[in-house]
């Protein structure tokens, strides 16, 4: 990748392919390509549900505890469960070590992720209880909030929590005038705009959408469609990860 100290790196280059100019990203991906994605559920033995999700160099682990008795008791609701979320970036997750104390950004993201999950968890099945969701970013290379909500949704499913749908997320960015899917950290740093999106695909509902920067109306529509297509791929990977775990478990039980 071109660019010396203090210079903006070359993030988009143009190549001739089959007589057409094609945008190539700094890591070799096409604009509509996701990074390599890995998912695994049931990774923590002491949690009721857990999941590890990797989007390229971004790694997030999520753990779910509950439904369990709400403490303190006065926070319990008579008709449904309360959902508590904690999004946290490990001090070693970034190049510059961060303080262990929650930052304003982490508190805000914990809130928006909780609101997205509340839309799919059938909490009325668990009155007077609490469901605690912890998301820890182990390594940050862009798209941490969308990887976190994807991992949290998988961990809830792994815990057997009833849900209307899974939630999957991805971030779209505008880099050097080109809309690109699943931006990494360097693209995020230099993007003219970035738009994290999370959806419940089978319900066709957008549960999280944030826009940093400026997009025209046409660009916004195209970015949302790009996110939708990427989320469908991620959603299929979520279902595959759950099937893999429970098929393996049933085979072991029948052995």
From Swiss-Prot:
Protein's job: Catalytic component of the exosome, which is a complex involved in RNA degradation. Has 3'->5' exoribonuclease activity. Can also synthesize heteromeric RNA-tails.
UniProt-recorded Gene Ontology molecular function terms: 3'-5'-RNA exonuclease activity; RNA binding
Localization: Cytoplasm
Pfam families according to UniProt: RNase_PH, RNase_PH_C
Location (main, coarse): cytoplasm
Keywords tagged on the record: Cytoplasm, Exonuclease, Exosome, Hydrolase, Nuclease
GO biological process: gene expression; rRNA catabolic process
Family, similarity comment: Belongs to the RNase PH family. Rrp41 subfamily.
EC numbers, comma separated: 3.1.13.-
Gene: rrp41
Name of protein: Exosome complex component Rrp41
One GO location term (cellular component): cytoplasmic exosome (RNase complex)
HAMAP family in alphabetical order: Exosome_Rrp41 (MF_00591)
Matches recorded under InterPro entries: ExoRNase_PH_dom1, ExoRNase_PH_dom2, ExoRNase_PH_dom2_sf, PNPase/RNase_PH_dom_sf, Ribosomal_Su5_D2-typ_SF, RNase_PH, Rrp41
Keyword Nuclease: yes
Description of how the protein assembles with itself and partners: Component of the archaeal exosome complex. Forms a hexameric ring-like arrangement composed of 3 Rrp41-Rrp42 heterodimers. The hexameric ring associates with a trimer of Rrp4 and/or Csl4 subunits.
Coiled coil ranges: none
Broadest EC class assigned to this enzyme: hydrolase
